[in-house]
């Protein structure tokens, strides 16, 4: 349980650190924003495949259980995509002002996409703590924490530029960080239920992260004409996770 609390504190703290740094970044060019998200996407791709799905196959002879877990994780995120709150409840602006601010609507949809994937990210870290392999356990947690810092910066700057108050923006970032903590506890609880269930949960967390990376993060990085920079940043993120897993 100590490892779970350490993982939760690390991931939550990394998101908040990124958010604080974001207050000092008044204007983040799309080129850098796409590169940062591409780097985060690379870490998530590596963490979901090398840190979760591959170990899941190695821990059981029932490969179909892992496949079911991967597909269930993707479907879970697909359903979450359909269940999003009214954006003006989050920003604190009245509905009319929100309708007239197309930039804010786009920013909030982007922030919601990041918030939604914090839950499966946390589940991935929580489930990996249940894994018998220490490298897998800390590799996934370190990888997610590393990408939480620039991701936190990416959340804060656009919100403030769109007119959301600094106080509300900071509380939004804290809420997003707490979603990840909830995911860690949920993932650890489900992964600890039985040794047979653990590979399914590893697959579930991996599938959810793959879905978010493909459906939300990569398309966002390719939407502003800087896809080459984002692609190389993704490769750098993937390599970072591989090297980090070897060193942990």
Language-model segments: what does each one mean?
Residues 1-248:
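Intrinsically disordered, metal-sensing/regulatory segments
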């Amino acid at each position: 349980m100590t490892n779970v609390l350490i993982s939760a504190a690390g991931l939550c703290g990394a998101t908040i650190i990124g958010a604080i740094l974001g207050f000092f970044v008044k204007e983040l060019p799309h080129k850098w924003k796409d590169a940062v998200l591409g780097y985060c996407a690379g870490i998530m791709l590596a963490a979901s495949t090398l840190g979760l799905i591959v170990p899941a196959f190695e821990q059981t002879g029932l490969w179909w259980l892992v496949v079911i877990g991967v597909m269930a994780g993707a479907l879970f995120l697909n359903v979450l995509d359909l269940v999003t709150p009214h954006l003006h409840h989050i920003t604190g602006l009245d509905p009319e002002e929100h309708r007239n601010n197309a930039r804010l609507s786009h920013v909030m949809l982007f922030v919601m996409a990041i918030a939604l994937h914090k839950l499966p990210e946390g589940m991935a870290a929580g489930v990996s703590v249940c894994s018998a392999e220490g490298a897998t356990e800390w590799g996934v947690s370190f990888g997610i924490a590393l990408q939480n810092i620039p991701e936190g910066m990416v959340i804060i700057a656009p919100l403030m530029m769109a007119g959301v108050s600094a106080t509300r923006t900071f509380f939004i970032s804290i809420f997003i960080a707490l979603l990840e903590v909830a995911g860690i506890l949920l993932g650890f609880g489900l992964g600890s239920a039985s040794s047979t269930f653990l590979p399914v949960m590893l697959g579930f967390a991996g599938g959810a992260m793959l879905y978010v990376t493909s459906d939300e993060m990569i398309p966002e990085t390719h939407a502003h004409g800087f896809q080459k920079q984002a692609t190389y940043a993704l490769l750098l993120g993937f390599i970072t996770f591989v090297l980090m897993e070897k060193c942990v």
